[in-house]
Amino acid sequence: MLFLMGVLALLLTTPNANADDKEKYKLFAEETRKEVWALKLPEFTNTAIPDKYKDESAVILAAHSRLEITKKTRFNVGAFLGGFHYIDREVNCRDLYRMLVQINDKAALKEFSEFDYKAEIRKKDWRYDENYQQVLGVRIIKPDGTVNEISTDEYMTATEGKKDQEQLQKLAVPGLEIGDKVDIFFFNYTSLENHNLDPFVFRFRQSHPMLSYTVHCEIDDKLTTQYRTLNGAPDFKQSKDENGNILLDVAVKDIEQTEPDLWYNPMQQTPMTLMYITNSKMKKY
């Protein structure tokens, strides 16, 4: 079953025609956070840190990337009457990155105390339609095991871009202290019509040691998927589900080497996988 199908259904329906965009986004964000926190990820229950990392500024206890992409087609009456190609091809993408981080000093506290991101972007013209929404979720896990989810009241919303069409969310994480663990995720929902997705990058090295990194992809087999492993990145285990969707999985443990701040070229040195997913039957004009 595809991840977050309930969230997708929420996006494709309008419970109240008079609800404004901010309320719709707030509901979407709340439902997304519920879905993500409910995911069964065993690696995120591991809180033991090896002695060799005890002096690190921060340790990524677990990280997880999840990518789910579906495709559907529909008849476009307006394009048909106008003499254009009349089959619209829509691609829906759900892209998640989540990590659990141990905060050990002031530098790490500063690094993980503030976040900003673009909540919504909409681009549309006669050739294509693009809708993008992003959700940030943050939880603080205290040394005694207490879990504090950051309330949506702590998020500040600003607008930018042409005619203030792009919403920018900002968050200063309250209550985070040295010795805490912070559970963070970024969830991106992208809907494209007659257009291709940007490439995806899975990085197997970060600025802090990483005890576990897992990647799971579910991709509609009607799309063209190509990927390339670079700099020693591990290859995916490939399979298919009962619906014929392409499944790609990889898991890596104890990534000790980190990316330095100076004299380092990630594209040439960081193990990573570049993935291109294209609508091979995208209409042409």
What are these regions (language model features)?
Residues A19-K284:
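Beta-strand-rich, non-transmembrane domain signature
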Residues L2-L11:
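Bacterial N-terminal signal peptides
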